[in-house]
Structures are given as structure tokens and as C-alpha cells.
């Protein structure tokens, strides 16, 4: 990650440096909280992975966010310390590769979740009868493999990680990334709009929303918090001009995007008046829409937060 710090004694620059340091410090703290939240979500989702196919998606999303936040925290340390600590080029490139890889994986998984949930809501009979048993597992595996391939191609063409870079191929690949980012965003917007219309106008509008609401909130979270980081990547590699403050702002919003998802899961699944007093496992099940198992689970909820096992 190239340092964009400007060292000068002018008052305006001193103000910018103070602002940037504040944003980066908040980013570190938020990333630390996100690591804890995603770690808990990852552990709980692993207990529930065979009960709900959508939990497989969220398990992969939590894994991608966990890796992203780890790399994100480490990568901004030189910026936070005003370049008093510099990583070797190998570490710098590796952190860049991993962050971009996890970002694209998370975006692709979110598009897959919104698409499958839209199909399940619009065509429930077809979805239950025709859906392949291992569809979710295959889609997740395909996303990880294809995103890894794209990341390796970009690393080989745009850096010296695997040898001499090819700048012409690098520009072409980043144009492909721009098209991919636009296509995934359009997919999420269209499927989320259809899902919202179905939820608000369908016969089930007075029933508990559960997972469809979670998907809608996750898409909104990406559009407002995750998308700026993608724009930063494109502007950096396609020579678009962006203000310096947007550079650090996109870092902060990327941390918000990855750290806020576990909070959405638990607040959406918690019962008003019982928040922070229910077992986290039951809260997550409710957010996933596993209402069938919650009847017996409500009795167990008297055990408190420590009851987190299946």
C-alpha cells in the first residue's frame, strides 16, 4: 500500500494529517471489534451450517471478512505511524493481494446470497423441489476459486510478485474488475428490489421477515460502506483522480462494512426486551429464519448467554 502522507508544516496540511490519523485510529479500533464479532459469528455459524443452506454463505462471508480485517489492520500500521515502520515489499504485496481477494469474495458471495434468496422468495415451490442439494457449497467453492484466480492474475500482471509486470495486461484486467464490480452491484440491486417488493406486497408481509430482511440490510450496508473501497481500488489502478481524504475514508468504511455484519445478524435475530439475555445461538438461528427450532429453544434461553452450543 503506497503511503500518501504529505509532510509539511502548513496549517491546512497539519489539519489534514490530524484528520487522517483520527480516521486511521478509528479504523484500527473498529477492525479489532469486527475481528471479535466475525469470530463469534464464524464459530456459531459453524455449529449451524448443516441446518440452513444460507448459513453456508454467511459462514464464508464471515471467513472472508475475518481475513480482510486482519490484513486491513496490519496494512494501515505504516500510515498510522507516519511511515516510521515500513514493511518489506513482499509483505506489502501479500497484504494487498489478500485484501483485494477477500473483498471480491465477499462481494460475490453477497450477490449469490441475494440472488438465491430472491429465487426462494419469488418461486418457493420451484426452489424447494428443483434446487440442487449441494448448490450452496458448489457456488461458494466456485467463488473462492475464481476470485483466487483473478487475484493471482492481477498480482502477476501488475506487481513484481511473480516476475516482471505486464502493464497492458494489468490495465485490461482492471477493466475486467470494473465490469465485474458493476455487474455484481447491479445484480444485488435488482434482486434486492424484487425481494423488497415481494416482502412488502406479498401475502407474507405481516409475518416475521427473518433472513430476507438480513439480506436487504447486508446489500444496503455494502452500497453505503463497502462500495467506496472498491471505487478506491479502481481509481488507484485506473489512474482516476480522487481526493486524499477519500483514500482514508474508504479504508474506514471498509472496516465498517466488514465489522457491522455480525451486529446486524444478532440485532435482527434478537427479541425486543430480551436483547443481550438470549443465547447467541438462538438469536442467530432466528436471523437465519430457522423458526421451526426456536419453540423448544425458548425454554433453553433462560440459561443465558453462555448457552451457545448446538
UniProtKB/Swiss-Prot annotation:
InterPro entries: GPCR_Rhodpsn, GPCR_Rhodpsn_7TM, MRGPCRE, MRGPCRFAMILY. Keywords: Cell membrane, G-protein coupled receptor, Glycoprotein, Membrane, Receptor, Transducer, Transmembrane, Transmembrane helix. One of its GO terms (cellular component) is plasma membrane. It is a multi-pass membrane protein. Residues 1-22, 82-92, 155-174, 235-248 are extracellular. Disulfide bonds: none annotated. PROSITE patterns: G_PROTEIN_RECEP_F1_2. The chain crosses the membrane at residues 23-43, 61-81, 93-113, 134-154, 175-195, 214-234, 249-269. This is Mas-related G-protein coupled receptor member E.
Amino acid at each position: 500500500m503506497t503511503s500518501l502522507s504529505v509532510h509539511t508544516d502548513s496549517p491546512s496540511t497539519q489539519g489534514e494529517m490530524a484528520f487522517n490519523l483520527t480516521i486511521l485510529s478509528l479504523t484500527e479500533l473498529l477492525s479489532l471489534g469486527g475481528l471479535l464479532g466475525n469470530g463469534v459469528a464464524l464459530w456459531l455459524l459453524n455449529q449451524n451450517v448443516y441446518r440452513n443452506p444460507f448459513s453456508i454463505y454467511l459462514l464464508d462471508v464471515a471467513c472472508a471478512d475475518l481475513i480482510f480485517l486482519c490484513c486491513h489492520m496490519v496494512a494501515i500500521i505504516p500510515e498510522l505511524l507516519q511511515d516510521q515502520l515500513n514493511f518489506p515489499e513482499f509483505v506489502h504485496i501479500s497484504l494487498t493481494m489478500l485484501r483485494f481477494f477477500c473483498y471480491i469474495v465477499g462481494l460475490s458471495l453477497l450477490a449469490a446470497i441475494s440472488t438465491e434468496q430472491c429465487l426462494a422468495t419469488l418461486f418457493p415451490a420451484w426452489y424447494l423441489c428443483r434446487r440442487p442439494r449441494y448448490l450452496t457449497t458448489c457456488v461458494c467453492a466456485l467463488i473462492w476459486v475464481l476470485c483466487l484466480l483473478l487475484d493471482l492474475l492481477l498480482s502477476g500482471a501488475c506487481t513484481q510478485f511473480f516476475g516482471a509486470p505486464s502493464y497492458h495486461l494489468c490495465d485490461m484486467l482492471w477493466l475486467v474488475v470494473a465490469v465485474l464490480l458493476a455487474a455484481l452491484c447491479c445484480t444485488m440491486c435488482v434482486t434486492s428490489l424484487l425481494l423488497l417488493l415481494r416482502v412488502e406486497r406479498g401475502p407474507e408481509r405481516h409475518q416475521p421477515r427473518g433472513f430476507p430482511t438480513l439480506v436487504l440490510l447486508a446489500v444496503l450496508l455494502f452500497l453505503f460502506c463497502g462500495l467506496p473501497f472498491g471505487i478506491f481500488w479502481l481509481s488507484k489502478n485506473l489512474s482516476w483522480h480522487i481526493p486524499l481524504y477519500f483514500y482514508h475514508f474508504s479504508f474506514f468504511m471498509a472496516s465498517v462494512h466488514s465489522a457491522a455484519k455480525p451486529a446486524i445478524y444478532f440485532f435482527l435475530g434478537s427479541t425486543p426486551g430480551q436483547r443481550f439475555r438470549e443465547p447467541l445461538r438462538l438469536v442467530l438461528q432466528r436471523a437465519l429464519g430457522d423458526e421451526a427450532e426456536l419453540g423448544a429453544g425458548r425454554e433453553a434461553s433462560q440459561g443465558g448467554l453462555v448457552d451457545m452450543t448446538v
